[in-house]
From Swiss-Prot:
EC number: 2.3.2.23
Protein name as catalogued: Ubiquitin-conjugating enzyme E2 J2
Gene3D superfamilies according to UniProt: Ubiquitin Conjugating Enzyme
Positions on the Lumenal side per record topology: 248-259
Span of the signal peptide: none
Record's keyword annotation contains Endoplasmic reticulum: yes
Region (Disordered): 174-200
Spans through the membrane: 227-247
CDD domains: UBCc_UBE2J
The protein's annotated pathway: Protein modification; protein ubiquitination
Gene encoding the protein: UBE2J2
Upper classification of the organism: Eukaryota, Metazoa, Chordata, Craniata, Vertebrata
Length: 259
């Protein structure tokens, strides 16, 4: 924070926001990071990382807090900049911790308290002024699109270089994953060192049958020869049996004629 930001804000607000900044650096808010503008300590920007098991998972949501000169005796206004499916963009949000409800504001609440309350309301579905209704599918689409959207924001990139690098690494991993060819499943694959038997009773060593191709072809050819030989023998037995039967009948008839 520069000396210019100190001069522009009243002493009380400046001192309090400095304390809150040190506190949030020492004890970060889960899923959220925040930075004041170097030129104006009364304007803070934040980034919400979409929590797991929510439609916002994988998304990055940039917004800002505008503190009044009377802070902490008056509440700030809150805006969301990144399309998210929960709040309108660049619109003052009506929450109990914002300037819409000065009567419920507590001067003891810090920037950490404000951001925690914002995240809590974001993952809920209760309506309020500045909120919108969208499906979980739409929220997931916006979460995926938030990466590219935020990288186009100059203020976002200047205030959150670590988050920018995190997003770029995630994009790189996604690109590498999508460019990989789809692996085709291998039949009869077993773990290394194990021996199983696949089709035709062939042993499988380390997932493959040794010499399976030539051996299988030989078995198939032998089976064909065996079938032809069996059919020929069956026909021969029928012919021999019929000849024996004819000879027997002829012998019986001859014996009867002699008597």
């Amino acid at each position: 924070m520069s000396s210019n930001s100190v001069k522009r804000a009243p002493t009380t607000a400046t001192q309090r926001l400095k304390q809150d900044y040190l506190r949030i650096k020492k004890d970060p808010v889960p899923y959220i990071c925040a930075e004041p503008l170097p030129s104006n300590i009364l304007e803070w920007h934040y980034v919400v990382r979409g929590p797991e098991m929510t439609p916002y998972e994988g998304g990055y949501y940039h917004g800002k807090l505008i503190f009044p000169r009377e802070f902490p005796f008056k509440p700030p206004s809150i805006y969301m900049i990144t399309p998210n499916g929960r709040f309108k963009c660049n619109t003052r949000l009506c929450l109990s911790i914002t300037d819409f409800h000065p009567d419920t504001w507590n001067p003891a609440w810090s920037v950490s308290t404000i951001l925690t309350g914002l995240l809590s309301f974001m993952v809920e579905k209760g309506p309020t002024l500045g909120s919108i209704e969208t499906s979980d599918f739409t929220k997931r689409q916006l979460a995926a699109q938030s990466l590219v959207f935020n990288l186009k924001d100059k203020v976002f990139c200047e205030l959150f270089p670590e988050v920018v690098e995190e997003i770029k690494q995630k994009q790189k991993a996604q690109d590498e994953l999508s460019s990989r060819p789809q692996a085709l499943p291998l039949p009869d694959v077993v773990p290394d060192g194990e021996t199983h038997h696949g089709q035709h009773g062939l042993p499988l060593l380390n997932g493959h049958a040794p010499g399976a191709g030539p051996h299988l072809a030989g078995l198939q050819q032998a089976n064909r020869h065996h079938g032809l030989l069996g059919g020929a023998l069956a026909n021969l037995f029928v012919i021999v049996g019929f000849a024996a039967f004819a000879y027997t009948v002829k012998y019986v008839l001859r014996s009867i004629a002699q008597e």
